[in-house]
């Protein structure tokens, strides 16, 4: 379960960094660039959710096998 917690923590840190990047860009960039950053953040979040799901499934499989 520590692997799952680690990945979850990484996701939160990554999302926090992306949010800060969006805040920084709001003051300097055009709305089109901000929208692009928001789309990238969504993609990163989706990939992290997918990795979390796969890791969770692997954790359950390992626990059920008893390795």
Swiss-Prot record:
Cystines in this chain: none
Biased composition (Low complexity): 22-33
Recorded superkingdom: Eukaryota
Region described as Disordered: spans on this chain: 18-37
Pfam families listed in its UniProt record: Coiled
Family: Belongs to the UPF0519 family.
Protein name: UPF0519 protein C
Record organism: Dictyostelium discoideum
Lineage: Eukaryota, Amoebozoa, Evosea, Eumycetozoa, Dictyostelia
């Amino acid at each position: 379960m520590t692997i799952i917690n680690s990945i979850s923590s990484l996701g939160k840190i990554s999302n926090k960094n992306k949010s800060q990047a969006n805040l920084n860009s709001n003051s300097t960039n055009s709305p089109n660039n901000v929208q692009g950053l928001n789309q990238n953040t969504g993609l990163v979040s989706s990939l992290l959710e997918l990795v979390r799901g796969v890791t969770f499934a692997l954790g359950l499989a390992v626990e059920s096998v008893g390795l």
